[in-house]
């Protein structure tokens, strides 16, 4: 029997040295700062993975990760330890700003140019509630203002499991609690067991793609009119946040916006002008 376990504890215990090594792996590959205070959470979330893979302890698992040449194992790791708590119309002030400020400006710009496409990136999209909310807002805006333009919403995440959930677009009732009833009826189909599925009219507006925000460059040939990266950078240290903000800046069009989580800040970036809490504009 593994000495790191007892009959009352189904989790595999992680030592201080093992925890330190695992924290380093997560930071180097994903930019996420795991705290040593997360020890119990890590044990509870990873123990089942270790058992399925046949590892007797965390040292064996970490040795395997360090020697691994592929990224499938790393994706499995981040899938297990990531917290994916989100819902439709989360931090609604951003969507008010989108409807009242950003979309009118984009409409004016489109009407005065040959380019009729709006490009929006939901970075760290988790299970899809954010990009689908954006799609709803755009559909409603175009219908209300009797305008029509091409819309491309790119939604990316490092986690394969949440991307699969996002593509399926099925959510329990607590995820749509902030959704007005008329939007619920218009854009969701009610399923059994109090679950709801996003209709195809929204699904076809959103393209989901796996992407690591720590990649040196992003595989995009065109810039964006708006980037959402909300409640993602809270896991990063200041250096990583600043590096990511600089990368976002390089993929934004002039006079476009970056929206981050309301508990997050970007400091010392001369290219991004602070507009209001969690809202920045590229000069």
From Swiss-Prot:
PANTHER family: CHEMOTAXIS PROTEIN METHYLTRANSFERASE
Enzyme class: transferase
Binding residues annotated for S-adenosyl-L-methionine, in chain numbering: 84, 86, 90, 130, 157, 212-213, 230-231
Alphabetical keyword list: Chemotaxis, Methyltransferase, S-adenosyl-L-methionine, Transferase
Sample GO molecular function, one term: protein-glutamate O-methyltransferase activity
Catalytic reaction list: L-glutamyl-[protein] + S-adenosyl-L-methionine = [protein]-L-glutamate 5-O-methyl ester + S-adenosyl-L-homocysteine
EC number: 2.1.1.80
Boundaries of every CheR-type methyltransferase domain copy: 7-283
Pfam families membership: CheR, CheR_N
Keyword Transcription carried by entry: no
Alphabetical list of SUPFAM superfamilies matching this protein: Chemotaxis receptor methyltransferase CheR, N-terminal domain, S-adenosyl-L-methionine-dependent methyltransferases
Function recorded in the entry: Methylation of the membrane-bound methyl-accepting chemotaxis proteins (MCP) to form gamma-glutamyl methyl ester residues in MCP.
Annotated protein name in UniProt: Chemotaxis protein methyltransferase
One GO process term, biological-process aspect: methylation
Cysteine-cysteine disulfides: none
Lineage: Bacteria, Pseudomonadati, Spirochaetota, Spirochaetia, Spirochaetales
């Amino acid at each position: 029997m593994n000495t790191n376990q007892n009959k009352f504890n189904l989790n595999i215990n992680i030592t201080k040295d093992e925890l330190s090594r695992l924290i380093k792996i997560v930071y180097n590959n994903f930019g996420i700062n795991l705290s040593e205070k997360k020890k119990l959470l890590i044990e509870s979330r990873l123990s089942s993975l270790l058992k399925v893979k046949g590892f007797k302890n965390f040292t064996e698992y970490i040795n395997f990760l360090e020697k691994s040449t592929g990224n499938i194992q790393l994706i499995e790791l981040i899938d297990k330890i990531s917290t994916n708590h989100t819902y439709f119309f989360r931090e609604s002030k951003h969507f008010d700003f989108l409807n009242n400020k950003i979309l009118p400006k984009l409409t004016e710009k489109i009407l005065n140019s040959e380019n009729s496409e709006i490009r929006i990136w939901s970075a760290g999209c988790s299970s899809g509630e954010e990009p689908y909310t954006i799609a709803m807002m755009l559909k409603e805006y175009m219908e209300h203002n009797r305008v029509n333009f091409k819309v491309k919403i790119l939604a990316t995440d490092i986690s394969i499991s949440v991307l699969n959930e996002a593509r399926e677009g099925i959510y329990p009732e607590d995820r749509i609690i902030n959704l007005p009833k008329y939007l619920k009826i218009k854009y969701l189909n009610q399923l059994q067991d109090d679950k709801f599925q996003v209709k195809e009219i929204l699904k076809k507006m959103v393209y989901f793609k796996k992407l690591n925000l720590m990649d040196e460059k992003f595989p995009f040939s065109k810039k964006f009119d708006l980037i959402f990266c909300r409640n993602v950078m809270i896991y990063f240290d200041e250096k990583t946040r600043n590096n990511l903000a600089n990368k976002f800046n390089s993929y934004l069009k002039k006079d476009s916006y970056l929206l981050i989580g309301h508990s997050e800040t970007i400091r010392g970036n001369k290219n991004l002008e602070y507009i209001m809490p969690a809202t920045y504009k590229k000069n």
